[in-house]
């Protein structure tokens, strides 16, 4: 049993070493990670397989492979439900935020389902002690895309009333607020909001 564990551990570590090569394209890194996941799954190492899948989602995000990201994350959520002893829900939430954002971009996913995924994300962040800031941020971004400026304003107000925490991305929010002010013709507001970015106060 120990020898078997050592063998697959070394096989996975060898693949991970290859992913450290900065000249690799994200697609090549993704393929190496998929092979590592296959080995972890074969050996029923759920904890490691989950870590590897979260890394894979990062590479798939760079490739804009939305549908594939969603499939990978669905597997992570299934594994979490069956292995709450080894997988911490909190570790999944940042990537869940990405996944929910992906669902808006896929026309084959009906809006009802997108909303249901958003509600599930909302439930999970609340029970892990996070504010709803990231939830409202996502909806405000999508309303701008849909040119629903009044609705976007409602979500922005709600977002700004929630506390900033580890699920928030201040630079993303600032970037988005600039888009909102520019889209709605509030150029003075956009200019004053842009100062921290111009002065490199927010990265």
Please describe what each predicted stretch is.
Residues 10-22, 35-36, 47-65, 91-105, ...:
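Non-membrane alpha-helical segments in proteins
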Residues 22-35, 62-79, 106-120, 144-158, ...:
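Helix-turn-helix repeat elements of alpha-solenoid scaffolds
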Residues 1-6, 12:
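C-terminal non-catalytic interaction modules
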Residues 82, 99-104, 164, 185-187:
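A general structural signal for short secondary-structure boundary/capping elements
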Residues 127, 131-153, 157-171, 179, ...:
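Extended alpha-helical scaffolds
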Residues 7-10, 24-31, 44-52, 68-71, ...:
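Residues within HEAT/ARM-like alpha-solenoid scaffolds
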Residues 3, 38-45, 77-86, 120-130, ...:
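Solenoid-like repeat scaffolds
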Residues 171, 175-176, 185-188, 199-203:
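Alpha-solenoid helical repeat scaffolds
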């Amino acid at each position: 049993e120990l020898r078997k564990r050592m063998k697959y551990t070394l096989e996975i570590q060898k693949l991970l070493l290859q992913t450290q090569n900065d000249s690799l394209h994200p697609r090549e890194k993704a393929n190496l990670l998929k092979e590592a996941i296959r080995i972890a799954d074969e050996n029923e190492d759920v904890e490691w397989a989950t870590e590897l899948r979260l890394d894979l989602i990062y590479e798939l995000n760079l490739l804009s492979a939305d549908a594939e990201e969603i499939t990978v994350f669905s597997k992570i959520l299934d594994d979490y439900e069956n292995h709450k002893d080894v997988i911490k829900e909190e570790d999944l939430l940042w990537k869940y935020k990405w996944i929910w954002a992906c669902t808006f971009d896929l026309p084959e996913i009906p809006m009802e389902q997108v909303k249901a995924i958003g509600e599930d994300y909302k439930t999970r962040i609340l029970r892990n002690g996070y504010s709803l800031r990231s939830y409202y941020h996502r909806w405000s971004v999508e309303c701008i895309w849909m040119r629903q400026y009044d609705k976007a304003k409602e979500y922005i107000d709600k977002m700004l009333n929630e506390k900033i925490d580890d699920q928030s991305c201040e630079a993303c929010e600032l970037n988005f607020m600039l888009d909102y002010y520019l889209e709605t013709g509030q150029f003075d507001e956009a200019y004053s909001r842009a100062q921290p970015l111009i002065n490199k106060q927010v990265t």
